[in-house]
Amino acid sequence: MLRRLVQQWSVLVFLLSYSVPSRGRSVEGLGRRLKRAVSEHQLLHDKGKSIQDLRRRFFLHHLIAEIHTAEIRATSEVSPNSKPAPNTKNHPVRFGSDDEGRYLTQETNKVETYKEQPLKTPGKKKKGKPGKRREQEKKKRRTRSAWPSTAASGLLEDPLPHTSRTSLEPSLRTH
């Protein structure tokens, strides 16, 4: 019985490992046709990475669960024959003190508490001094009125260009 089973398995392994041409092509040719594309390789790589990441998360979650559920060992369960390590002092363990709030840093040791400043409501903007623009216009007029005196001497015929006319309009002035 065992001998017959071994014979069947050996024939099966031989047939599977022997390359038989299929449809006139060799098995190596079929292997080339079945090559995966780069995108398929990337997909399989990403899938493997995500599975590995999931396994790592489960492992870490299980590990953290063991840490959090581990029993807290009391320090009083020390064996009676053990000696404390040399150069160490037995101080009581204190996690907080009663006078902790008394000695704070300089910034937080203020008597007054912080008060929020009220937000400014948006209002009208302040305007400049009233009449300042008028003063500037008066100065310009003064300088303009001083120009015709130079025209009388023959230096300038037209002191100011007329901005109301465009260059396409015919000249209405007679010279």
UniProtKB/Swiss-Prot annotation:
This protein's record includes keyword DNA repair: no
Propeptide: 25-34
Protein's organism: Mus musculus
Protein name per its UniProtKB record: Parathyroid hormone-related protein
Entry superkingdom: Eukaryota
Annotated signal peptide: 1-24
Pfam family, one: Parathyroid
Motif interval(s): Nuclear localization signal: 108-129
Changes seen on gene knockout: Lethality at birth, probably from asphyxia. Mice show widespread abnormalities of endochondral bone development: bones are shorter, wider, deformed and undergo premature mineralization.
Record keywords: Calcium, Cleavage on pair of basic residues, Cytoplasm, Hormone, Nucleus, Secreted, Signal
Region (Important for receptor binding): 57-68
Subunit details: PTHrP interacts with PTH1R (via N-terminal extracellular domain).
Listed Basic residues bias regions: 122-132
Any one GO cellular component localisation term in the record: extracellular space
Gene: Pthlh
PTM remark: There are several secretory forms, including osteostatin, arising from endoproteolytic cleavage of the initial translation product. Each of these secretory forms is believed to have one or more of its own receptors that mediates the normal paracrine, autocrine and endocrine actions.
Region spans: Disordered: 74-175
Molecular function terms, GO-annotated: hormone activity; peptide hormone receptor binding
Function: Neuroendocrine peptide which is a critical regulator of cellular and organ growth, development, migration, differentiation and survival and of epithelial calcium ion transport. Acts by binding to its receptor, PTH1R, activating G protein-coupled receptor signaling. Regulates endochondral bone development and epithelial-mesenchymal interactions during the formation of the mammary glands and teeth. Required for skeletal homeostasis. Promotes mammary mesenchyme differentiation and bud outgrowth by modulating mesenchymal cell responsiveness to BMPs.
Sequence ranges of Basic and acidic residues compositional bias: 109-118
